[in-house]
């Protein structure tokens, strides 16, 4: 090594030795229990479902510190009550947070006097969305409604009193006031007066966005301000359903499902959208998913029956109807759909018993229409005419009912009503034909997925073909009725309409020959 190299090495080494040493950044001290309590309180006011779960978890951990235990326990009670309410509002699987809140309250030596009342309200108040309370679907739901009705005045007064000072009380006051008929005369501003001190909290802003109606702008603003408000997607989907924006609704429900899979109201909502979109296989899959989560979900059972019926799976539909009847909910609907599937299998005696039972529980046009069809197949023509007449009275726009009523009158050789009814039925069926063609044009021009478009168009072409055969039958039977009534010009007019028809042509030509 040369002398120059030695000098260079010495200089370099000396410079390195003189360089300042890197100092590691100081580790911040851990948050104190008081700071952690404040952070958990902030999560409660933030109001999103995940925020509430995080707050509950933090309060639970803080209960191990003796000097923070009471405040942390009260915080855990508050968070548990809010989680329980949110789960019921959203229709999530309820995980016993009301019971946890009651258990925690029993460990505190001094609780606010209003707290037991608020927790009773959390337990009893039905789920609601946009002010619309969900229909009870179990004996437990009915008992909750009874308790709420009996205690409404006492509970509402106590909860309203506490609403200005506590987030749980404020949220429950608004949950009660926004959904019950007893407060319908108050404006929304009046409903929110007791919670004015908490009005800046997103927790309260969420209630403002869902009080009496769902406000898409307010909901979107909440999600923009705090992306953790994932539950907003469900409510936005409900708004889309109300606006008949089914693809947008499906997207919002899919976002909600991606966030929480254990969510039966979302899986059922996806199934309902698929049913309306005529995607029956997808609808069935999500009704089945709903029933995996909630085996006695009666709305999903009824939806499953409909999906199976439209898929032509009669035996499975009947078995599902049996399940629904055993639960003693929607018995009339279950009897109707069971009768419909039994009639498809030509079990007409069983179908008749079911449709007659349905008639005692449902007042609509569909039940007597089905009864008319079943009676016709059982060769009970007078009974059939009676049921079709009732169905037509209840829904004069059902062309098929009108058609069958005319056919039965023709078979009974009651020519005057047969002729007049069948002329009207044929006109009605022609209007249906025109409307289906317009629907096909609309579907073809839409941006729906190609597979869905093809299925919907194919289904309407089947309806058109069926309707045209019914029109041909109506024209021929009208010709027969008019011939027997000596209304020769009308008999000729309607016979000519089917003179070239493969089914009726020869007989129509025979009528025309007799008229010459």
Can you say where each PLM-predicted feature lies in the sequence?
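Start-of-helix register in tetratricopeptide repeats
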Residues: 34, 71, 78, 168-171, ...
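Structural marker of alpha-solenoid helical repeat scaffolds
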Residues: 65, 111, 161-165, 197-198, ...
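Single-residue signature of alpha-solenoid repeat helices
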Residues: 55, 96, 101, 151, ...
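Residue-level recognition of tetratricopeptide repeat
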Residues: 41, 78, 82-85, 121, ...
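TPR-repeat structural position
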Residues: 49-52, 91, 98, 184-185, ...
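Canonical tetratricopeptide repeat
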Residues: 75, 172-175, 207, 235, ...
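Register position in tetratricopeptide repeats
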Residues: 45, 82, 242, 276-277, ...
């Amino acid at each position: 090594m040369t002398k120059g190299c030695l000098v260079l090495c010495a200089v370099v080494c000396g410079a390195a030795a003189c360089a300042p040493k890197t100092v590691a950044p100081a580790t911040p001290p851990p948050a104190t229990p008081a700071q952690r309590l404040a952070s958990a309180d902030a999560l409660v006011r933030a109001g999103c479902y995940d925020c509430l779960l995080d707050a509950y978890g933090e309060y639970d951990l803080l209960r191990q510190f003796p000097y923070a235990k009471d405040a942390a326990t009260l915080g855990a009670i508050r968070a548990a009550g809010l989680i329980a309410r949110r789960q019921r509002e959203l229709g999530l699987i309820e995980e016993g947070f009301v019971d946890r809140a009651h258990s925690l309250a029993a460990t505190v030596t001094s609780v606010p006097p209003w707290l037991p009342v608020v927790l009773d309200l959390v337990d009893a108040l039905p789920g609601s969305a946009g002010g619309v309370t969900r229909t009870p679907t179990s004996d437990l739901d009915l008992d909750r409604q009874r308790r709420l009705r009996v205690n409404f005045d006492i509970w509402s007064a106590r909860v309203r009193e506490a609403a200005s000072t506590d987030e749980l009380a404020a949220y429950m006051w608004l949950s009660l006031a926004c959904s019950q008929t007893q407060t319908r005369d108050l404006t929304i501003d009046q409903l929110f007066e007791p919670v004015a001190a908490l009005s800046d909290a997103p927790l309260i802003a969420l209630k403002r966005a869902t009080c009496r109606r769902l406000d898409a702008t307010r909901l979107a603003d909440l999600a923009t301000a705090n992306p953790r408000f994932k539950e907003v997607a469900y409510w936005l989907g409900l708004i889309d359903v109300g606006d008949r924006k089914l693809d947008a609704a499906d997207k919002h429900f899919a976002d909600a499902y991606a966030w929480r899979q254990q969510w039966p109201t979302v899986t059922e909502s996806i199934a309902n959208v698929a049913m309306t979109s005529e995607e029956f296989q997808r609808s069935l899959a999500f009704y089945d998913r709903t029933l995996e989560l909630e085996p006695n979900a009666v709305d999903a059972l009824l939806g499953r029956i409909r999906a199976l019926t439209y898929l032509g799976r009669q035996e499975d539909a009947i078995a599902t109807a049996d399940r629904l009847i055993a639960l003693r909910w929607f018995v009339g609907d279950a009897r109707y759909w069971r009768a419909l599937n039994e009639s498809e299998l030509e079990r007409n005696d069983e179908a008749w018993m079911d449709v007659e039972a349905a008639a005692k529980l449902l007042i609509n046009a569909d039940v007597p229409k089905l009864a008319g069809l079943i009676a016709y197949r059982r060769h009970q023509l007078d009974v059939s005419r009676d049921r079709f007449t009732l169905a037509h009275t209840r829904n004069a726009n059902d062309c098929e009912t009108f058609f069958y009523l005319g056919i039965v009158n023709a078979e009974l050789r009651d020519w005057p009503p047969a002729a007049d009814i069948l002329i009207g039925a044929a006109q009605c069926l022609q209007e249906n034909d025109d409307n289906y063609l317009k629907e096909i044009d609309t579907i073809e021009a839409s941006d729906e997925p190609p597979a869905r478009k093809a299925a919907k168009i194919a289904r309407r072409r089947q309806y058109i073909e069926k309707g045209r055969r019914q029109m041909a039958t109506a024209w021929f039977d009208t010709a027969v009725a008019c011939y027997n009534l000596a209304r020769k010009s009308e008999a000729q007019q309607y016979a000519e309409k089917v003179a070239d028809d493969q089914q009726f042509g020869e007989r129509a030509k025979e009528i025309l020959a007799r008229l010459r």
